[in-house]
Design a protein with these regions (language model features):
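Short intrinsically disordered, low-complexity coil segments enriched in acidic
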Residues: 1-3, 314
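Beta-propeller domains
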Residues: 296-314
Length: 314
């Protein structure tokens, strides 16, 4: 491994963006095998023997962090045993939310009860579980609501992993973490954000191949483009944007169209989003919530969203 383009975290460089944004990952012994859509393979020898494992980078800055690699592999164990033997087939699903709307070809990948990753079509009303990987194809999009009312939406040709979630209203604890590999996305915090109001602490994190977004009681739009660069448009709350390794922080705390775009792995701040940035976001984001969806901020009983959508379609 060599030094990262971002800092001294060890890094191995990928041939091109097809391996970064569209590669299929497989653990073969201690090796990590990445296959791009054309069927070309790239082997990271002894990846699982590194401590820490290297970032898998492009020379322009974006990369796959060890956490993202683990999430893409859907391994039901943590980083502390990532170099261990085969995954335990006893996988307990932990519900984190549900799909409120799915239009077009939307699929989910998750670890099945036999220890193998399964791919399923997604429809309105389906439950979502910790570790689920959502994929939208073509012009498809999907809207999800977590148990606390947090909303997370994905636009066309997008890929994201619901890597971590917890919510205990009685204990006033919770967190939401997601990896977005490509595509447009929208986030709006629910009860977790309200519980953390006034605290100097992030309650949610969105990670991409080029940025990490720390969130406090916020609403935002974002997009990961075909080169792995990330654009964020601030709508509300307090956002801290860093590079892949958590360095070079930039704060977005101005309500309005403040935006950030990452280039060569280092965040840059723009007080006002450019017309080009706005156009790119709007092209890749899912449709905004309807007035009925906006009224339902804190979640509801199962079935309510489905009934609303059916009424809209009739």
């Amino acid at each position: 491994a060599v030094e990262s383009a971002v800092n001294d975290h060890p890094a191995i460089y990928l041939p091109d963006t097809s391996f970064l944004l569209e590669g299929q990952l497989e653990k073969v012994g201690f090796d990590l095998v990445i296959t791009n859509p054309e069927g070309v393979t790239f082997v990271v020898a002894d990846y699982f023997s590194y401590s820490p494992p290297p970032n898998l980078m492009l020379s322009s800055g974006p990369g796959l962090s060890p956490g993202l690699v683990m999430a893409k592999l859907h391994l039901p164990f943590g980083d502390d045993v990532m170099f261990a033997g085969p995954a335990n087939s006893a996988n307990v699903l932990e519900e984190v939310g549900k799909v409120t709307l799915a239009i077009g070809k939307v699929t989910v990948k998750r670890m099945g009860p036999d220890g193998q990753v399964e791919e399923l079509d997604v429809k309105r009303g389906d439950k979502l579980y910790k570790g689920d990987e959502l994929v939208t194809e073509g012009g498809a999009f999907v809207k999800a609501r977590m148990l606390d009312g947090t909303r997370f939406h994905l636009g066309k040709n997008a890929n994201a992993i619901l890597s971590d979630y917890s919510f205990d209203e009685t204990a006033k604890t919770g967190n939401f973490e997601v990896y977005v590999i490509r595509g447009g996305f929208h986030y709006k915090s629910g009860k977790i954000g309200k519980m953390f109001a006034g605290l100097n602490k992030n309650h949610s994190t969105i990670s991409t191949p080029s940025a990490t977004i720390g969130i406090r009681g916020s609403e935002l739009d974002g997009n990961v483009d075909e080169f792995g660069s990330t654009t964020i448009r601030h709508t509300d709350g307090y956002l801290t944007i860093t590079d892949l390794n958590g360095d070079n922080p930039v704060v977005l705390d101005t309500i309005g169209n403040t935006s950030i775009i990452t280039f060569n792995g280092v965040p840059a701040k723009f007080e006002v989003a450019s017309p080009e940035q706005i156009e790119t976001l709007n092209q890749n984001l899912p449709p905004p919530d309807t007035p009925e969806e906006l009224l339902d901020e804190d979640g509801d009983e199962p079935g309510t969203d489905e009934e609303k959508v059916v009424e809209e379609e009739d």
